[in-house]
Amino acid sequence: MDVNPTLLFLKVPAQNAISTTFPYTGDPPYSHGTGTGYTMDTVNRTHQYSEKGKWTTNTETGAPQLNPIDGPLPEDNEPSGYAQTDCVLEAMAFLEESHPGIFENSCLETMEVVQQTRVDKLTQGRQTYDWTLNRNQPAATALANTIEVFRSNGLTANESGRLIDFLKDVMESMDKEEMEITTHFQRKRRVRDNMTKKMVTQRTIGKKKQRLNKRSYLIRALTLNTMTKDAERGKLKRRAIATPGMQIRGFVYFVETLARSICEKLEQSGLPVGGNEKKAKLANVVRKMMTNSQDTELSFTITGDNTKWNENQNPRMFLAMITYITRNQPEWFRNVLSIAPIMFSNKMARLGKGYMFESKSMKLRTQIPTEMLASIDLKYFNEPTRKKIEKIRPLLIDGTASLSPGMMMGMFNMLSTVLGVSILNLGQKRYTKTTYWWDGLQSSDDFALIVNAPDHEGIQAGVDRFYRTCKLVGINMSKKKSYINRTGTFEFTSFFYRYGFVANFSMELPSFGVSGINESADMSIGVTVIKNNMINNDLGPATAQMALQLFIKDYRYTYRCHRGDTQIQTRRSFELKKLWEQTRSKAGLLVSDGGPNLYNIRNLHIPEVCLKWELMDEDYQGRLCNPLNPFVSHKEIESVNNAVVMPAHGPAKSMEYDAVATTHSWIPKRNRSILNTSQRGILEDEQMYQKCCNLFEKFFPSSSYRRPVGISSMVEAMVSRARIDARIDFESGRIKKEEFAEIMKICSTIEELRRQK
């Protein structure tokens, strides 16, 4: 069918055509190899922005540190990190004046959180720098290792399970003269394989004890490991991101809790809300500015971009902000919150894996670890790398670089938003004391500035004043990358505003399609994505119906489950045809079993099994939903699962979908090759931890417990719970006397074994 494309736009308002400008088909770029170069760039750039600051030496670690605070006022438009303490404090004071009681209330809310948070909060999150092994690990493993080391060094406050008590241990660990840790290492040896008679490398894993003196321990505790940010579109160069270790994480969490609580109360803040709630909040600010600028005033909006936001922020400024925000609070609370910025003022950046060299002629490859960069002859490197290394050398200690200024990506998003909003807040007429005034939106480093004034000169003056005020607190608006427009058209955090936020449905395109988890989850995720886009992104009924048909087609090709009566031949068609022929009610077969598709845009919210249940043959029902089916390793049956979907822009989003466990909810087995590497010991620890937690969850309904810490308490809790449950079941006649006696006997045996151990 030939369509004249101009017909598509006949009755469409211009802003709705945004979805046709979508540039992001295909895969985003991923980084390969080492991130060392990117990290060195970050460290060198950060120091360059603050180069006129004062140099000092950290007495504990011997690290050279640069402090740009209260440095020279800028005389040009170059980005700089010379924030002025008194200006930041004044901005905070005015913010409080405009929002009476905001800091007080947020402190009270945070204090409650601090006293209630369990240490398992730190198991959330992906890769975390594990200081005991000096590399990245899943968060739960890194936490378990840290606690294990703390306990073996006599730090036991963490046993209460409260995060605040774990942090007491962290503080105490920094005063210790030495810490003993267990590290994993691997031995390689060449042996002859009996079968093939070839030489093979055998690896064995060992654990060994190692003592760290105070200085080495402090360096590790203050280290942020770095990686390359993956899947960033629209950039030529990759960049580095940081993962902090367990010592820093807990403190950061509390600071961000406080800042989040403040952001929730600020109408200009684009955090912590998202999606439609965020759009509504932002639309209010725009509406306010437009209604106030009736006929007498002009109103312009800047779609803003800041130069290197976090490299010009400074932890010392955040310390000043926290000191002010918590000024009437109890001493212990002020101390807990000030530790994160203090640790960040003394942070060390781990430079990653180092450089890989290869000689084409001799077919040799060798890794130069970052520890060697301080001493290696620079003649082996190319010119740009040589310059980088020369610049960073004075900052190197044990393969990490001292990085006092700057914040590293994504650490204090909420708190830096508070700083940005405090400058937007100064735009009220009572503060500008002139004819122009401004307001705007801030979300981490992204901002939109709305300026109102009687004439163009006033607008220009307002923008200049805003620009200079920002400079005073270390925010550098980029004049090259920001643009100004009549209010009513601007972009903020990838939302495009034109007389209201425009639904840019094409941003969600990458998340349409088959996820590849398993047949059951993929079907559910696929229809949920379509449903969500109908709700949130103006996906119209006709387009949705088409998306659904394309999805089903895609799904059938992926899992080779074409309808039982189709002519298409695949590896599965023989079995599916047989099933089709012996099924009485063919409409009841799932799509993944060669059945027809019963979905349309009205019933996307119903899981397929429920949609077809009444139509299924009885024996098919019995096979499909049979927990005893030996071929299925069942996931836990939860009513809601989470899938990770990738929009074109911004971070991966978590999306909930209904999960009905059937024989199609299989889990692919893990790749076995990991078992031959040094990760093996860690993997076993992790599986052990998972097993314990899963077992524990069987005993306690999810409402009544928080994930435990420390094995000792878990066993006792499970035994006593088993006894109580058994007694109740016995008295109500649910179990027989013999079963009750057997349970009691098992419980006693477990306790006996623990006593012997």
Swiss-Prot record:
Q: Which InterPro entries match?
A: RNA-dir_pol_NSvirus (IPR007099), RNA_pol_PB1_influenza (IPR001407)
Q: Where is the composition biased (Polar residues)?
A: 55-64
Instruction: Write the Enzyme Commission number(s) for this entry.
Output: 2.7.7.48
Disulphide bonds annotated for this chain are: none
Task: List GO molecular-function terms, semicolon-separated.
Answer: nucleotide binding; RNA binding; RNA-directed RNA polymerase activity
Location of the RdRp catalytic domain: 286-483
Q: Where in the cell is it found?
A: Host nucleus; Host cytoplasm
Q: How is it modified after translation?
A: Phosphorylated by host PRKCA.
Q: Which segment of this protein is annotated as the motif Nuclear localization signal?
A: 187-195, 203-216
- Enumerate the Pfam families for this protein: Flu_PB1
Biological process according to GO: DNA-templated transcription; symbiont-mediated suppression of host gene expression; symbiont-mediated suppression of host mRNA transcription via inhibition of RNA polymerase II activity; viral RNA genome replication; viral transcription
Query: What is catalyzed by this enzyme?
Result: RNA(n) + a ribonucleoside 5'-triphosphate = RNA(n+1) + diphosphate
Instruction: Fetch the Gene3D superfamilies from UniProt.
Output: 6.10.140.720
**GO cellular-component terms in the record?**
host cell cytoplasm; host cell nucleus
Where is the segment annotated Promoter-binding site? Answer: 249-256
Subunit relationships:
Influenza RNA polymerase is composed of three subunits: PB1, PB2 and PA. Interacts (via N-terminus) with PA (via C-terminus). Interacts (via C-terminus) with PB2 (via N-terminus); this interaction is essential for transcription initiation.
Function per UniProt: RNA-dependent RNA polymerase which is responsible for replication and transcription of virus RNA segments. The transcription of viral mRNAs occurs by a unique mechanism called cap-snatching. 5' methylated caps of cellular mRNAs are cleaved after 10-13 nucleotides by PA. In turn, these short capped RNAs are used as primers by PB1 for transcription of viral mRNAs. During virus replication, PB1 initiates RNA synthesis and copy vRNA into complementary RNA (cRNA) which in turn serves as a template for the production of more vRNAs.
Family designation: Belongs to the influenza viruses polymerase PB1 family.
Q: What is this protein called?
A: RNA-directed RNA polymerase catalytic subunit
Identify the species of origin.
Answer: Influenza A virus (strain A/Turkey/Wisconsin/1/1966 H9N2)
